[in-house]
Amino acid sequence: MHKYRTHNCNELQLSNVGQEVKLSGWVHRRRDHGNLVFIDLRDHYGITQIVFTDQNQQLMYDASRLCYESVITVSGTVVARSLDTINNKLPTGYVEVLAMECIVESASSPLPFVINNEKEAPEESRLKHRFLDLRREKLHNNIILRSQVIAHIRHLMIARGFTELQTPILTSSSPEGARDFLVPSRIHPGKFYALPQAPQQFKQLLMVAGFDRYFQIAPCFRDEDARADRSPGEFYQLDLEMSFVTQEDIFNTIEPVLYDLFTKFTNKTVSNTPFVRIPYNESMLKYGSDKPDLRNPIIISDVTEVFRDSNFTIFRENIKKGSVVHAIPAPQAASLPRSFFDKMIEFAISKGARGLGYIQFSESGEAKGPLSKFLTGQQLEILKATANTSNGDAVFFVSDKKDEAVKLCGKVRIKLGEELNLLEKDCFKFCWITDFPFYELNEETGKIDFSHNPFSMPQGGIDALEQAKTTEELLALTAYQYDIVCNGIELSSGAIRNHKPEIMYKAFSIAGYSAEEVEQRFGAMIKAFRFGAPPHGGIAPGIDRIVMLLAEATNIREIIAFPLNQQAEDLLMNAPSYVEEKALKELSIMLSPSSRKIHKKNTNL
């Protein structure tokens, strides 16, 4: 018989009754019934009940003193449970093991929090003792799910003709939109490597090198603040790139992968392929966001023309100054009490609005509310049709400059969806957002900058770039850039790449980069493109966010084995940490006087 186990704790069935077995695991629960002691023994696979009887008084006494989470090895005989003690919640619930021997392999110290229930402990304590936290069933299962998802992704990608390749972790800095994590070079004083924010240039170089379809489960590093759906520091993505493809080819490749993943690992309804395609401008108007949650049926409308000649002076004057009026319908909300409308107004004001107008249409069709008296009967009918409202509905209004109105309407739409319980249950609603602006105005400098990925191909190519002369014309340019969104969460951005040096130089020059700067930052890629670069494109769905959705986790740290906290600290390994002065000197690093003082104090030098 094996030294530690003949079976795992999820295996034993009625067919094993009468067999002598050996199990090892952790003491999950202990129940003392006087002449019987029950231990729920847990391992990676499941739980088996162990019974200690008074036929062996010493063994039963020892079992009664076992600490939770101690590791033990039990030898015994499999017996059937009586009908009244069968536990249908466990795969092993029809049997138990009558213990004949129990060896304590490793006794546990007192626990900082309870392991055997799902009551949440303080997150700081959980992260400091992550090895204990990972024993909890829900979190343990999340990590197993993550492993299964990644394994299935590999299977799906290889089956579609993709080659898995690894790209460097130590590379050069590039403008990906976030701060880099820098690594000083000992051999080259004063120079730094950067951890990759994404394998962007390398995967494009692989296409130039003739690898037709590439993928990897890529670690990416960005010095960003934490959010509920974004871990600071490190994250993983399904990075892929394809040669000789159009935008639709990318869509047709990744849609079946996502559909397969979400149908395999959940029982929820998943959007049928092809997924809905929504141009960026349409998404911003209808949903007030480029990450729309399509479970919410509310669609925003532009009703500026309805109010242009209305008797409502505030909106009419706003329109004359260039503002717009957008309507957000509230289905079947007309009969709700005044407190509901006051609550929505307070919410809008808290988000920066000056107010929130509304009209209620009763079941009989009568218009009520603060703004109803300012519209004629004909204007009200046009409003109902434009805003897609019916009798029994209410409709809210926002008037502001277009960009501000769009953002606020999006927030009001989400709030209404929650307040009115409108979100469709048990489903994953996917959509593509397409035709993103190629450029945007930098909020800090007021100058033209890339809206998203600077390596995207502008729609219309070099001709479009050369013909756009004014700022308005430049901001109207669109890119072959796309996002995949699920339930209001952006899973990935992607693009058809700019593979022509002359277009790249022109695109960067408009954004204020000289040819020398482009050569310095992207010299390897520019050089490669001069030796025959295929048209290519790609996408990189975030694995962390996919697993988060599949696990129904509310925080991304719940699907990562060893995450950083919101302050980008690893409380278990005490990272980041101070290093000795000798190590800094070897890297030619000198701290500022204030940092040096703190450093000396913490390194006891």
UniProtKB/Swiss-Prot annotation:
The protein's enzyme class: ligase
Site, Important for tRNA non-discrimination: residue positions: 33
Family annotation (Gene3D superfamilies): Bira Bifunctional Protein, Domain 2, GAD-like domain, Nucleic acid-binding proteins
Gene Ontology biological process terms in this record: aspartyl-tRNA aminoacylation
Cited SUPFAM superfamilies: Class II aaRS and biotin synthetases, GAD domain-like, Nucleic acid-binding proteins
Binding site for ATP: 222-224, 490, 542-545
Record EC number: 6.1.1.23
GO terms for MF: aspartate-tRNA ligase activity; aspartate-tRNA(Asn) ligase activity; ATP binding; nucleic acid binding
Family annotation (CDD domains): AspRS_core (cd00777), EcAspRS_like_N (cd04317)
GO CC term, one of those recorded: cytoplasm
Region (Aspartate): 200-203
Protein biosynthesis keyword on record: yes
Known catalytic reactions: tRNA(Asx) + L-aspartate + ATP = L-aspartyl-tRNA(Asx) + AMP + diphosphate
Annotated positions binding L-aspartate: 176, 222, 452, 497
Record keyword Nucleotide-binding present: yes
Compartments where located: Cytoplasm
Keywords: Aminoacyl-tRNA synthetase, ATP-binding, Cytoplasm, Ligase, Nucleotide-binding, Protein biosynthesis
Role according to the record: Aspartyl-tRNA synthetase with relaxed tRNA specificity since it is able to aspartylate not only its cognate tRNA(Asp) but also tRNA(Asn). Reaction proceeds in two steps: L-aspartate is first activated by ATP to form Asp-AMP and then transferred to the acceptor end of tRNA(Asp/Asn).
Subunit structure: Homodimer.
Protein family per UniProt: Belongs to the class-II aminoacyl-tRNA synthetase family. Type 1 subfamily.
UniProt name for this protein: Aspartate--tRNA(Asp/Asn) ligase
Species for this entry: Rickettsia prowazekii (strain Madrid E)
